[in-house]
Swiss-Prot record:
Any Pfam family matching the protein: tRNA_synt_2f
One GO MF term attached to the UniProt entry: arginine-tRNA ligase activity
Family to which the UniProt record says this protein belongs: Belongs to the class-II aminoacyl-tRNA synthetase family.
GO terms under cellular component: cytosol
Catalysed reactions, semicolon-separated: tRNA(Gly) + glycine + ATP = glycyl-tRNA(Gly) + AMP + diphosphate
Coiled-coil annotated spans: none
Protein location: Cytoplasm
Key words of the record: Aminoacyl-tRNA synthetase, ATP-binding, Cytoplasm, Ligase, Nucleotide-binding, Protein biosynthesis
EC number, UniProt record: 6.1.1.14
Gene (UniProt): glyS
Name by which UniProt lists this protein: Glycine--tRNA ligase beta subunit
Organism this protein belongs to: Actinobacillus succinogenes (strain ATCC 55618 / DSM 22257 / CCUG 43843 / 130Z)
Amino acid sequence: MTTENFFAEIGTEELPPKALKKLATAFAENVENELKQAGLAFDKVEWFAAPRRLAVKVLNLAANQPSKEIEKRGPAVSAAFDAEGKPTKAAEGWARGCGITVDQAERLVTDKGEWLVHRAVIEGQPTKNLMLDIIAKSLANLPIPKTMRWGDKNVQFVRPVHTVTLLLGGELIEGEILGIASGRTIRGHRFLGEREFQISHADQYPSLLEEKGCVIADFNKRREMILTKSQEKATALGGVADIEDDLLDEVTSLVEFPNVLTAKFEERFLAVPAEALVYTMKGDQKYFPIYDKEGKLLPHFIFVSNINPVDPMPIIEGNEKVVRPRLSDAEFFFNTDKKQRLEDLLPRLQTVLFQQQLGTLLDKTKRIQSLAGEIAGQIGADKAKAERAGLLSKCDLMTNMVFEFTDTQGVMGMHYARHDGEDEEVAVALNEQYMPRFAGDNLPNSLVASSVALADKFDTLTGIFGIGQAPKGSADPFALRRAALGALRIIVEKNLSLDLADLVKKSAALFGDKLTNANVVDDVVDFMLGRFRAWYQDGGIAVDVIQAVLARRPTKPADFDARVRAVSHFRTLDSAEALAAANKRVSNILAKVAGEIRSEIDRTLLLEAEEKALAEQVLALQSELAPVFAKGDYQTALDRLACLREVVDNFFDKVMVNAEDEKLRQNRQAMLNVLRNLFLQVADISLLQ
């Protein structure tokens, strides 16, 4: 089979840096899917992305589509011809659809009869005739939230397109994509290398672009260069670079030929909380901060330039000049804010709405204060500290620093509280109330902080559900999904004995008559249990395990987690499959019983040896496991229940449950009811697949 490497590049104006990697990988995935759909063989699709280009390279792409045989079955011969042997309308219509006449059709004989059939071979097209359409479709299906038009063209794309290059080996695939005719012209770096040059063969990409155009098209290569050089620069300064993946990807998306440099700022700025300085460096300037070995911020930072002059000092000084006013602003805000105590800002919260129907931030603060104290009492935290932290929880939103640098909310509250002489646990809780901020983030360290974090999240969940504004589709303006999952993580991972329904009831009571949804408790609990499902599925827990536990609707998250772990373990036992099937059988039998089913077994009505054996074990386990269930030791309980497999199997093999004698029948049903209820104290095992 003849193969060639294929290459396609779309040259654009500067693409959105936060979206570049996603666009490039989606482009490659789309191309791969289109190639497979077209039946074209290939080894691999590589993707490339730089600020002004998206590109793919298909390795060892087949030069032709394979030919394929088709078989279209028509009507049965008995229905294809009338009594005189002439084709019926059904046969003629089918033949027309196949592009043949009825007499050209073949016959297919099966054990069910004889049929008309059309067989043909469709010759595969040359790959070069297909690639223009494949690339166009792949670009059209990119995840672009907002497109733009340019010039006098009617086409739309994420940014204006200037060049399109499609090469199959050395052959140019001619045509037009996004209003631009395909050609061999590749654009280089804006300031380095050749501005434009010609590419003659797909194999020359991306090396020719780097050699002539001073552009490293390989996103991952640029990323690794920036990461390695940044770490080296930080080490040379006796520190460690703070390089987050998202910021590294964004910086990689901003440069075509990275030049990693270091700069400094005045040490006096280190008197400002490091978080505010880092927010400016990372968020505004896209710099990498440097910390010493003890985690203290150093007066240096790393930045990445897109040019590589002989003398880098003008660039370094320029970046130092740019960041200085931002750090000065942070210093000014910090010093100004310290002139007022956090508590003095409480009245200003009355001027800011949390939500029109739910009141102001001051209203929310008072609810958090009350609920945090309630939660603290339940989990053994200091109630007074939790209430104090709840009272101060939103005060930093009124400071100059947080108004200017919004991502510093919480952390600045902590620093200002320390300055005010607040208890350290209270101060730290002001920062940790927002934890976890994202998937995988740290949880609050102390129980005081956990109390405030939970109070804040439950207040938001209860309030928004209470006015009927639950998330719909992907829209979640109050981040309720994140709040729910964060609350669940805190309760489960810290093993807190808290009940969701109880917390929502207490939270709802604090809203007075503001809530209009009478079902708010059930709605919030169901929503949070739904988040549990997603969380466990992401963690690799089988869906049927989650459904088995959900069927019992346990509303204590720590208890829910213990059940899931126990059922996951039970599922691995040799007896699990048979007991799940037996539970399903028991469930079906009991579902057909009219009226109430007894839950006491009458030993005098036990006749068969197999039912006596089952009753003996079931009653023994009922007594033995009562304290085990009370402790929530569900794994031990299921391990013990697993020993019932043999006696349950023997019972169903030898005993007729629905006996004609009513007393016998009801007693056997009662025994199955006791058996099933033992399992139901953990989960509905009958739902296991």
